[in-house]
Amino acid sequence: MEKVIDITERVPAMKKRRRRRTNFKFLALVTIFLFIIIILLYFQLPYSDIKKIDIKGAALKEDTYYIDQSNLKINDSLWGFKISEVEQAIAQHEWVKSVTVERKFLNEVQITVEEWQKVAYISQDGEFYPMLDNGIVFEESNEIVPIDAPIFRDFENEALRKKLLKELANLKPEVLSLISQINANPTEADPYSITLFMNDGYEVRADANTLAEKLNYYPSIIAQIESEDVSEKGIVDIEVGSYYRPFSDEYTLIKENTEKTEEPAEETENADTEEGGQLEEQNEEEPE
């Protein structure tokens, strides 16, 4: 037979459970209230103001430039701006590839800028302007001859320049650092013909369309040349295949071609001189 529990025995337990439930609700309400008070105080007091603006990834421009472009200032409200608007203000510059703005901790803003890579310089009016891998010429110049990237000379063709910039961006960093100067020497047969002058003393003839594909093998090509005890530096031609000839052979060939070109001109000049002399003799023999 089941035991019958008197209601008077259950009352204390019920009161205890009710008291616990009431205390829990009270604590929850107090916690929420305190949390709201803290948030209100945070927004009202200087703790929610910007105390630091951190710029990461800037190379072409100073950190202060990007801070000015963001329109953010120290002691502005950390929550008083839209992230998308700040990102748009910085990303509108053609040398900026991407930008990310983040609120850090309780009073910091971090702006991460990814710029287009500088791959070369172009010489204009005695100054050197950085060229980026998206094809643009950066607005700020340098009067000092740069050593951190190759220099473009005689690149009047914009299509050729942009094509070459893309190829340089695909080069291995260790190969790109070996290039000192690049000259454009287009012809009707090959409008993309270029000449590269390397820091190690060699000269490379190449086609801009296939430069990255072939020039990435440059270190191994030079290693093979020097392993054959070649005592003279020269020209590495990778326009079609890949072959090497010393500078002395190249200059001898140029000299011979120049002499062959000059010989017909000299013969013509001599013939004209002889013909002129014969005419003078005939004029002297004619009676007055």
Swiss-Prot record:
Main location: membrane
GO biological process annotation, one example: FtsZ-dependent cytokinesis
Coiled-coil portions: none
Biased amino acid composition, Basic and acidic residues: 253-263
Residues in the Extracellular compartment per record: 47-288
Membrane topology: Single-pass type II membrane protein
Gene3D superfamilies in UniProt: 3.40.50.10960, membrane protein fhac
Composition bias, Acidic residues: 264-288
Pfam family, any one: POTRA_1
Topology Cytoplasmic: residue spans: 1-25
POTRA domain location: 48-116
Keyword Transcription: no
Cited InterPro entries: Cell_div_FtsQ/DivIB_C, DivIB, FtsQ_DivIB, POTRA, POTRA_FtsQ_type
Annotated keywords: Cell cycle, Cell division, Cell membrane, Membrane, Transmembrane, Transmembrane helix
Subcellular location: Cell membrane
Region feature Disordered, mapped onto this chain: 253-288
GO cellular component annotations of the record: cell division site; plasma membrane
Family classification: Belongs to the FtsQ/DivIB family. DivIB subfamily.
Function: Cell division protein that may be involved in stabilizing or promoting the assembly of the division complex.
Entry protein name: Cell division protein DivIB
Source organism per UniProt: Solibacillus silvestris (strain StLB046)
Gene for this chain: divIB
